[in-house]
Regions:
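Post-HExxH zinc-binding segment in Zn-dependent metallohydrolases
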Residues: 117, 123-165
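A metal-dependent hydrolase signature that marks the N-terminal structural subdomain at the beginning
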Residues: 1-75, 200, 208-209, 213-234
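Active-site recognition of the HExxH zinc-binding catalytic motif
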Residues: 103-116
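Active-site scaffold of zinc-dependent metalloenzymes
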Residues: 58-99
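Alpha-helix boundary/N-cap detector
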Residues: 1, 14, 18-32, 96, ...
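Helix N-cap / beta->alpha transition motif
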Residues: 51, 87-91, 201-203
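Short, hydrophobic/amphipathic alpha-helical patches that form generic packing surfaces
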Residues: 106-107, 132-136, 140, 176-179, ...
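Pan-zinc metallopeptidase signature
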Residues: 154-234
């Protein structure tokens, strides 16, 4: 159940009734987004759940430069099995516009594909950690699969290119989250940007078995993305 953590937080009285009801009411937008991405890509969306807090990252010393992370792609080893989980923050579900929610879900899906690509090539260990938000945005942009190679859905592609010209900023949404969530002292999780970088041991990497068909699909998408990038350059 993708809402299990939210339900637990509500039962404990951490999330108030009105906020909880709003998230439940708007959750079908997330379900619609996941279905849309699966249809547009022909690939199943990874496990996703709603995190009942706002996730805030600051790069450390310059603590004034903080960013709200509306969703994160998290690799986990669970009972010797590797799984990628998409964490969607509750404030995104509560206050995001439909197009924004779908764009962020699609963006995390591209992260997921990128992660699987790296695992298949075994090049996860040397991934650099970038300490400032701008660098992270830049690293993000240079590595992700081209959305046009992955999704056959023009509206979805428009959402992605509008929302992520060079990293995601949605000031209206951020203002809402600050006003209705952070200022009301609702749950907040602080993460350092370093913890957003994936670290898996060589041993756990060697245990991961990918479905050969899925791996071939990833290779095809990588090839297609490369072609689109070349076109952009010339």
């Amino acid at each position: 159940d993708p809402l299990i953590r939210l339900k637990e937080a509500h039962l404990k009285g951490i999330i108030p009734d009105d906020t909880y009801d709003l998230i439940l009411k708007r959750f079908p937008i997330v379900v619609g987004g996941v279905n849309r991405i699966e249809k547009a890509s022909g690939i199943q969306y990874p496990v996703a759940y709603v995190e009942p807090s706002v996730v805030v990252s600051s790069p450390g010393l310059n603590s004034y430069e903080f960013g709200i992370l509306f969703a994160r792609t998290i690799p986990v080893m669970f009972e010797e099995r590797f799984q990628v989980v998409i964490q969607i923050s509750a404030p995104l579900v509560a206050y995001g516009l439909k197009g924004t929610i779908h764009a962020i879900l699609a963006h995390e899906f591209l992260h997921y594909l990128e992660l699987i690509r790296k695992i298949s090539k075994m090049d996860l260990l040397s991934d650099e950690i970038s300490g400032n938000l701008f660098e992270n945005v830049y690293a993000d942009e240079t590595r992700l699969f081209e959305s046009r190679a992955v999704f056959k859905d023009r509206t979805l592609l428009n959402h992605i290119t509008k929302k992520f010209p060079s990293g995601f900023r949605d000031y209206k949404l951020e203002d809402k989250v600050i006003k209705y969530w952070i200022d009301k002292n609702l749950p907040k999780t602080n993460v350092s940007l370093d913890s957003n970088t994936v670290k898996l041991s060589m041993e756990s990497l060697s245990k991961i078995r990918l479905d050969p068909q899925f791996q071939k699909r990833i290779d095809d998408l990588e090839h297609k993305s490369g072609k689109i990038r070349k076109k952009k350059l010339y």
